[in-house]
């Protein structure tokens, strides 16, 4: 009798293992296809899928394959595992920068031998925390874009405290620009007041650069993907940010008068989002500085466990990107992005002549 019971139990266990193993495998394979298509299509309606990084989905998919492998033995498991690994390596934002180098090479000490070298930093100040601006200034930047910025008075007091008369400041309510040289503030539409700070910067050598610090609409953080309302909210927020960015970039382009342009800030969107497609469509040939020369992990949020890259610096064709990195901070929930740019000699000379 006991032997019969054991036999039935083993039979039931075998059936359970078979169907559960195939269930895990089908879910993993289907998820792989869905994530791949979501990356290709980048449609607003599926924007919720583009918030977690590709490697996070890869870990889920590979975990399902591993669980399936304990239950059933099939070559399809290996095929789906290889598909997940290939998907992650090819599509993950981190793969490209890690291929250039495992560790950042940009140092705190700036090369001062070239007068056309410009160091740019963008950082979210985490609720107007002045200490993060102090951190940024230790890198001797020529330009700092801040979001959730300290007030103009607080920034001016910091410069007086440091007895640094090279810098000027514009903005300071949500976005601000701190730069060496002469800043001339630009007026943006009132609807963008809480999302931008724009200025033209005249460098000591007379070159003029158009600058913009931006902070797009806050993202939602809900992850209940089984709830239709979650997808709707992500969809609407993504559309709001796209409208903001298009309006901001259109205004920036109209104000620049063909000057060299640098803009950056907190985009509040995963780099897998279709939000960033607006930049080449409106601005043309612009370079994401970390994409061009960054090494190591470029993710900026959160500071202590960076899983997504939402803070960026972009430069026009007038600049060459020397180096870039994402740097851990002590006083913000974001990491700061630091980039060294070289204003091309021809462009510098042309603007001096004009």
Cite the ranges covered by each PLM segment.
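Transmembrane alpha-helices and immediately adjacent membrane-cytoplasm interface residues
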Residues: 59-107
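Catalytic-adjacent loop/helix segments of enzymes that bind and process anionic phosphate/sulfate esters
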Residues: 186-252, 348-354
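Metal-dependent phosphoester-hydrolase catalytic domains
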Residues: 6-78, 200, 253-261, 267-354
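Short extracytoplasmic/periplasmic juxtamembrane "stem" segments immediately C-terminal to an N-terminal membrane anchor
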Residues: 105-127
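Short, solvent-exposed loop/turn segments at secondary-structure junctions
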Residues: 126-128, 151, 183, 216-219, ...
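Structured beta-strand-rich core segments of catalytic domains in phosphoester-bond hydrolases
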Residues: 89-109, 131, 143, 147-220, ...
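Active-site beta-strand/loop signature of hydrolases that rely on acidic residues for catalysis
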Residues: 32, 49, 119-125, 132-156, ...
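Structural motif corresponding to alpha-helix initiation and N-cap regions
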Residues: 129-130, 307
């Amino acid at each position: 009798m006991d032997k019969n019971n054991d036999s039935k139990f083993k039979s039931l266990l075998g059936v359970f293992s078979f169907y559960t193993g195939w269930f895990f495998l089908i879910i993993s394979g289907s998820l792989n296809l869905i994530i791949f298509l979501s990356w290709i299509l980048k449609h607003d309606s599926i924007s919720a899928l583009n918030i977690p990084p590709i490697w996070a989905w890869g870990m889920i998919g590979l975990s399902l394959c591993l669980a399936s492998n304990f239950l059933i033995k099939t070559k399809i498991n290996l095929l789906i595992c290889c598909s997940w690994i290939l998907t992650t390596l090819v599509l993950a934002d981190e793969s490209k920068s890690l291929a250039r180098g495992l560790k950042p090479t940009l140092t705190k000490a700036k090369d001062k031998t070239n007068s056309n070298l410009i160091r740019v930093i963008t950082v979210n100040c985490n609720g107007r925390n002045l200490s993060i601006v102090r951190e940024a200034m230790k890198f001797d930047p020529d330009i700092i874009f801040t979001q959730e910025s300290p007030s103009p008075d607080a920034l001016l007091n910091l410069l007086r405290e440091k007895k640094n008369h090279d810098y000027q400041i514009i903005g300071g309510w949500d976005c601000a620009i701190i730069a060496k040289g002469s800043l001339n503030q630009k007026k943006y539409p009132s609807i963008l007041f809480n999302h931008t700070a724009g200025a033209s910067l005249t460098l000591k050598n007379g070159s003029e650069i158009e600058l913009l610090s931006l902070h797009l609409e806050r993202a939602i953080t809900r992850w209940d993907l089984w709830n239709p309302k979650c997808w709707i909210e992500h969809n609407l927020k993504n559309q709001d940010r796209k409208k903001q960015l298009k309006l901001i970039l259109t205004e920036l382009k109209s104000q620049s008068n063909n000057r060299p342009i640098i803009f950056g800030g907190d985009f509040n969107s995963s780099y897998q989002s279709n939000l960033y497609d607006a930049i080449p469509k409106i601005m043309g040939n612009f370079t994401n500085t970390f994409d061009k020369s960054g090494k190591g992990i470029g993710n900026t949020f959160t500071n202590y466990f960076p899983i997504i890259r939402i803070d960026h610096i972009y430069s026009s064709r007038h600049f060459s990107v020397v180096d870039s990195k994402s740097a851990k901070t002590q006083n913000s929930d974001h990491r700061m992005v630091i980039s060294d740019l070289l204003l091309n000699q021809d462009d510098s000379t042309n603007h001096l002549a004009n």
